[in-house]
Amino acid sequence: VNTPNPLLPIIARDGDNIIVQGPITIDNVVSVTQRGAALFDQPHCVIDLGKVTEVDSTIISMLLEWLRAARQGGHQLEFVNMPASLASLIQLYDVAELIPVTPRHTEHQTAI
């Protein structure tokens, strides 16, 4: 049985979204940064961070690198479902104006 390692992050496309799951720390941030940037293939990419389980300050550099890579490729990124621990780091490092965050990602719903 091939069980995913809970210590290794998963980055995968789910429709129009890019889902990031697991820890993002100094131990894996370079790999995660490269793997994530490779998925920026649409004009507007939604990055769902709701399943990120652990962060350290290196995630800030990852998000900024993703924004730079997306801008160079003509893409726009939107980060959604940000964990409180990451939101705190963004405030601590005073980069909230640089990182576009949507507080909660909701699907378009039709009134019945």
Features from the language model and the residues they span:
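STAS-like cytosolic regulatory interaction modules
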Residues: V1-V55, E65-I112
